[in-house]
A protein has these predicted regions:
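N-terminal small-domain helix-loop-helix segment of the aminotransferase-like
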Residues: 4-96, 100
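Structural scaffold positions in well-ordered secondary structure
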Residues: 35, 165, 200-202, 228, ...
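PLP-dependent aminotransferase class I/II
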Residues: 45, 222-301, 306-308
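Conserved core of the PLP fold type I
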Residues: 60-191, 198, 203-221, 284
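Conserved PLP-binding catalytic core of the aspartate aminotransferase-like
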Residues: 288-289, 299-333
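PLP-dependent enzyme catalytic core of the Aspartate aminotransferase-like
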Residues: 331-332, 341-372
Length: 372
């Protein structure tokens, strides 16, 4: 009788934790009113499309990115009025910056494995980057009204001394701005042992506040703070551009693990184009903020629906039955994000992206808030 041994497989060399993971799933959205991914819903005018096409057609795509990326960094520094003593680095979206931070902070001389800490529910990439790079991740639940639990956060900071503490401002998916006083206390607690705090301002174009003002007014107190933003919500989600600024000494070290030419020359050209036409995107953001208030008012008037305050281009809404509401909207051609299983605090919650005025009217009609 011949015994059959299982042949060796290349999968044996793939990490077991990776094999146990699920790839990030993107919902099928063709033919739908797409209100699931916090994208800017506005397209460029035909005139701007033609101008951008001319610029991209003239790009030397046979050459590696070089001075064009430097031009973009310079333009972004001017755009944000970067504070003295700060530097800025670019990423292929903020996702790459999150990965680079984890890579740079994996181990130190005193700790074989460092820790990343973040409030939950929050952006999934904080935990995923820690897992993929081999760091420990500690999640600290928010309060029931989605505020930072100062006592729990400070206890976690004291216990684990995380290399990086992420604070989204405003948060995803809850869309709220956390109390600035609480954030200052957390930053100070991390600074006491040298820990970094990353303020993620992905939704800054729609927010009433920015932590950049704090960095300017109190540079020493924020010397351990890195500010991260993306141009996705600016209107360039398809381009993949993110940037991070902070103390030059810190940025210079993290920039060492960035792959060369991580931002393509085409992406850099589109970024420069967008900054040149920043007023167009600012006007789009203004419309989105007005529409957000219209949606909030209409949703508040609906029975059995609880919308939460938003400083982003999304609204978190609690329904009596989120799964039923999600399927009903989908049956009417409207795609939103069902976040009800992401965290116990999000039970029966859907996240609605603020769309164009017409898209938002369709959403409200589907929810029974607008006459057919």
């Amino acid at each position: 009788m011949t015994s059959h041994q299982e042949a060796p497989s290349p999968l044996d060399f793939i990490r077991q934790d990776v094999q146990g993971m699920h790839a990030y799933a993107v919902q099928e959205s063709r033919g739908m009113v797409k209100l699931d991914a916090m994208e800017n819903p506005f397209t460029l005018s035909h005139e701007l499309q033609a101008l951008l096409g001319d610029r991209l057609g003239a790009v030397a795509i046979n050459r590696y990115p070089g001075s064009k990326v430097d031009d973009l960094k310079g333009a972004l520094k001017s755009y944000v009025a970067i504070p003295a003593g700060c530097e800025l680095m670019l990423g292929n979206g903020s996702d790459e910056l999150i990965s680079l931070l984890a890579m740079a902070c994996l181990t130190t001389k005193d700790k074989p494995k460092n820790t990343i800490l973040a409030p939950l529910p929050g952006f999934v990439m904080y935990e995923m980057s820690a897992q993929l790079q081999g760091l420990d991740f500690i999640g600290v639940p928010l309060t029931t009204d989605f505020e930072l639990d100062e006592t729990a956060m400070l206890a976690a900071v004291a216990t684990y001394k995380p290399a990086i503490t992420y604070l989204a401002y405003p948060n995803n998916p809850t869309a709220n701005l956390w109390d600035a006083g609480t954030i200052r206390v957390i930053i100070a607690a991390c600074r006491a042992y040298g820990g970094m705090v990353v303020i993620d301002e992905a939704y800054q174009p729609f927010s009433s506040l920015t932590w950049l003002d704090e960095i300017r007014s109190a540079p020493v107190a924020n010397s351990n703070v890195l500010l991260m933003r993306t141009l996705s919500k600016f209107g360039l989600a398809g381009v993949r551009l993110g940037y991070m600024l902070g103390n030059k000494t810190l940025i210079d070290q993290i920039d060492k693990v960035r792959p060369p030419y991580n931002v393509s020359i085409m992406n850099a050209e589109v970024g420069l184009f967008a900054l040149h036409h920043k007023d167009v995107f600012a006007n789009q953001a203004a419309i989105i903020k007005l529409e957000r208030e219209r949606l909030l008012a209409a949703l508040t008037a609906l029975p059995s629906v609880t919308p939460f305050k938003s400083d982003a281009n999304m609204i978190l809404v609690r329904f009596k039955d989120a799964n039923a509401a999600f399927e009903e909207l989908k049956s009417q051609g409207i795609l939103v994000k069902n976040v009800s299983k992401m965290h116990p605090l999000l039970a029966n919650c859907l996240r609605l992206t603020v769309g164009t005025p017409d898209e938002n009217t369709l959403l409200l009609k589907a929810l029974g808030s607008e006459p057919s």
